Amino acid sequence: MSPRMAWRAIQSALPKDAIISSDIGNNCAIGNAYPTFEEGRKYLAPGLFGPCGYGLPSIMGAKIGRRDVPVVGFAGDGAFGISMNEMSAIGREEWPAITMVIFRNYQWGAEKRNTTLWFDDNFVGTELDQQVSYAVSYTHLRAHETTS
């Protein structure tokens, strides 16, 4: 499923008062074009060149502040990896569960794209380990993973 299809499908299933967040990167930049906001709908985003790792902590705060409202975050696997320290906070029993959609392309996509454009397809350090599973790493913190 493409990021565009995922954004559209998830947004169409959410109620109008839902809070949506995204991180930086190619997958979220695509999604920035799709959310619409009606009846108090909120969109939390760092902007295209904002702080990497913003998505997870932003939905944590939004869900703690508005437990009664659905909150969904979107991030690429690179940006999500930056915020892995926040996973220790999510495991607190008194905190509500959150929903984070992680797009897995196993690379720092924006950086790889820029280096292939600017340096004749010469890129280094942009590939992520395909064996890493964020959910397996933090299973004891109530995380689980779904793929499609």
PLM regions with names:
Residues 29-142, 148:
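Thiamine diphosphate
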Residues 1-46, 84:
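Cofactor-pocket helix-loop regions in the catalytic cores of large enzyme subunits
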